[in-house]
């Protein structure tokens, strides 16, 4: 089957399974099985399609989206986004089958698979207007998946603001070029400088969807109250479509100005640092992971910002390094954040708690989930040999290249960005230690944690599968990075002083070194050892006498107190009249439902 056929079949499977899941929604396990199996098959097709594009000599594939009559194009860049969506949605779909067996869980197959279908269409359509419509359908589905009226209300309000900005850009572009087809726009603007006033509203609108700080208000609330599969899709699919839109408007209509790339770099650095800092303060594991998603969105923006800066300055080496680093980290983030959200969901499934202060000792109760979560957390902290390390290392190289260029702004920003990213990495390592230590080590703090059992086998399989993807993405990085580089048709001399097999061996050896040192330096064991209760100054030892998440983060909280207060000082919600009204959530959800229905009918009728 051709690449275009695979994409068409994937969208069809998503849509058909969504409809069938809705039909059988009253029988929740059956609805979940239909949505999960259909979503898994469609996601596997996207992975095959994306991989085929990267491996084929012919990198550009064009055609029509079946039943919708929308022109689509699958090139190297589109293929990377298809991989990011498919690799995340595959374990999420499998996980969702068992998730529907929990008595407190509502059937979500219609919204989840409709979201995935819209996201797939969004990253392959060739018309900027179609991109906005598909992104809107996806965002509305996500708003209903938040599981909380307050967070859904905030997402709907901010999302409509972003949609208005995107629509404004569409109107400006139509008025200027007479078309919304990206290929025709770029043909008219070949070798010309971009008019940023046309595209800036769209950039802000897509940045809001991507959760770039300070446009991130919806993200932590939406993740905290949503189901684990939905929260995973928010981070790995919805926000990635926002990044796709940001990159699209950055490159459309000619060569972007230098300040555009610098703006993306600044936005990425602010988002990465603030997201990592706020994550360390959280105890709700899904809210914590949401802030870490913001951190990684910032890191991806740093890579894409370096790429756009290279385009503006016609520096091919900076272009390639920024593109490889940003895009590889985009895929890697989808993998390890899927691992973490699904792992957190498996823990909730057995304990009913998302607050890590109420857990502890889960590692002994759920060993495979614990191991997979450790892999995901190490990848999140960019520790070798996991996949998070590879993408960030290439982004560091782009900063080093920037600091040796001819432009003063590059020589100024390169070292500053490298130091900022290093500090952000240190915060991520602290967060890794906090989450794993407080949740999976130590003694259980509640009866639910003490009585926890292993998760259902399909849940465990999904989490372990995502963790294996993280490991493969790190060890195989020397061979995968050239494929990512080939997705963008610019060649540059970017060489390495170490061979690819040697890099892979070093990545494998890094985590083994501590164990080798332990074996080498260990002394003789005592012939007889006695065991007793821990000494706590004469008091009886209690399970609560362990390191808490609050105590672990307290030094950083005191050091950065002014920055942490910003989210309270700069909260725009308090300024909106009627926002706290009890009737506001129901009213906004009603409007969202009508808008979603109208958009779906319009898209279907256009295809008919």
Placement of each model-derived feature along the sequence:
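Transmembrane helix-loop-helix hairpins at membrane boundaries of multipass inner-membrane proteins
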Residues: 1-12, 16-110, 178-189, 486, ...
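Interfacial loop-to-helix junctions that mark the boundaries of transmembrane helices
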Residues: 2-6, 69-78, 129, 185-193, ...
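Alpha-helical transmembrane segments and their helix-start/interface "positive-inside/aromatic belt" motifs
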Residues: 28-41, 153-160, 286, 290, ...
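Hydrophobic alpha-helical membrane-insertion segments
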Residues: 37-51, 161-170, 373-385, 462-479, ...
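Membrane-interfacial helical/loop segments at transmembrane boundaries in membrane proteins
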Residues: 59-67, 183-187, 394-409, 479-498
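Hydrophobic alpha-helical transmembrane segments
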Residues: 72-86, 194-206, 409-425, 496-514
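Hydrophobic transmembrane alpha-helices and their helix-loop junctions in integral membrane proteins
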Residues: 91-101, 106-131, 140-454
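Aromatic-capped, Gly/Pro-kinked transmembrane alpha-helices
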Residues: 480-505, 521-608
